[in-house]
């Protein structure tokens, strides 16, 4: 029973920290790239990879 009490007290704290940090990360990404459907750093990799430069 003590293990169940420990689990029930730790899981909400960990999930709150996890979702809080995830929300903060998404807020910061949205601050630097507002209203972005695609993010430029992914697009740059696709453009560079699609050039087909050969040695």
Swiss-Prot record:
The chain crosses the membrane at residues 7-27. It is found in: Plastid, Chloroplast thylakoid membrane. GO terms for cellular component: chloroplast thylakoid membrane; photosystem I. Its main location: plastid. The keyword Plastid applies. The keyword Transmembrane applies. Pfam families: PSI_PsaJ. Keywords: Chloroplast, Membrane, Photosynthesis, Photosystem I, Plastid, Thylakoid, Transmembrane, Transmembrane helix. One of its GO terms (biological process) is photosynthesis. Belongs to the PsaJ family. May help in the organization of the PsaE and PsaF subunits. This is Photosystem I reaction center subunit IX. It comes from Gossypium barbadense.
